[in-house]
Curated annotation (Swiss-Prot):
Involved in activating dmsEABCD gene expression related to dimethyl sulfoxide (DMSO) reductase. Required for anaerobic respiration on dimethyl sulfoxide (DMSO). The gene is dmsR. It comes from Haloferax volcanii (strain ATCC 29605 / DSM 3757 / JCM 8879 / NBRC 14742 / NCIMB 2012 / VKM B-1768 / DS2). PANTHER family: DIMETHYL SULFOXIDE REDUCTASE TRANSCRIPTIONAL ACTIVATOR. One of its GO terms (molecular function) is DNA-binding transcription factor activity. Residues 155-206 form the HTH bat-type domain. Disulfide bonds: none annotated. Keywords: Activator, Plasmid, Transcription, Transcription regulation. Disruption phenotype: Cells lacking this gene have no dimethyl sulfoxide (DMSO) reductase activity under aerobic, anaerobic without substrate, anaerobic with DMSO as substrate nor under anaerobic with nitrate as substrate conditions. Cells are not able to grow anaerobically by dimethyl sulfoxide (DMSO) respiration. DMSO does not activate transcription of the dmsEABCD genes induced by the anaerobic conditions. No effect on aerobical growth or growth under denitrifying conditions. This is Dimethyl sulfoxide reductase transcriptional activator. Coiled coil: none annotated. Induction: By anaerobical conditions and dimethyl sulfoxide (DMSO). It comes from the Archaea. InterPro entries: DmsR-like_N (IPR056433), HTH_bacterioopsin (IPR007050).
Length: 213
């Protein structure tokens, strides 16, 4: 699927910034979400969107049997607009899949600290947000998280922050690329406090895995 979706409230052509963090998010839209991707009639293959004030113009390519068709949708942009939420943090959402149940979005950020704020904002607008992949590239040590899907909506803000920094710095890789003390120093907390947060995260994720089986 081509990189296609763009939604930026205000153009800032004079601002250039390397976006070296790649996120892949799985989002379950709110029940009354106005986005045309929240309830497509068929599987979405490609999306192009353009925000014009409070109006969203979308051209959605959907599967239609053995063929495909392009559907144009014009909707009023509400407070639940996902494109606007991404634009608040100066990143562009790229729709990778939408099937009526969830929307898979890829985006890039320049600062790890923004991840938590972005996820918290999306969590306010949606039923559920899951981080499927966190990748760091463009810095000479490209590494991709090998962990399973993390349901971020089940974690507290502090647990979410601890989980994200642990994944990003390779704490759960084998062998580990960082130590607990280094992560605790980066967060400005004690090793014991970080250990408690990560233990709580791991317990919640383990419970979620068994509950889904």
């Amino acid at each position: 699927m081509a990189d296609s979706t763009s939604g930026v409230a205000e153009a800032k052509a004079d601002t250039l910034r390397e976006q070296h963090l790649q996120l892949l998010l799985e989002i379950e839209p709110a029940k009354r979400c106005s986005c045309p991707l929240a309830g497509p009639d068929s599987a979405v293959e490609d999306v192009h969107t353009q925000l014009d004030g409070d109006v969203c113009h979308a051209e959605v390519t959907v599967g239609d049997g053995d063929a495909s068709k392009v559907v144009h949708a014009t909707t009023s942009v509400g407070d639940d607009c996902l494109c606007r939420a991404f634009a608040e943090f100066e990143c562009v959402p790229r729709i990778r899949r939408a099937d009526g149940e969830c929307i898979v979005v890829e985006t890039y950020l320049s600062d790890r600290a923004v991840i938590t704020d972005l996820v918290e904002r999306l969590d306010e607008l949606t039923e559920r947000v899951c981080l499927r992949r966190l990748t760091s590239d463009g810095r000479g040590d490209s590494t991709e998280s090998k962990t399973a899907t993390i349901d971020l909506s089940s974690l507290t803000a502090k647990q979410r922050e601890a989980a994200l920094i642990a994944v990003h710095h390779g704490y759960y890789e084998t062998p580990r690329r960082t130590e607990l003390a280094t992560l605790a120093e980066a967060l400005g907390i004690s090793k014991s406090a970080l250990s408690q947060r990560l233990n709580a995260v791991e317990a919640k994720l383990a419970t979620a895995v068994f509950d889904s089986e």
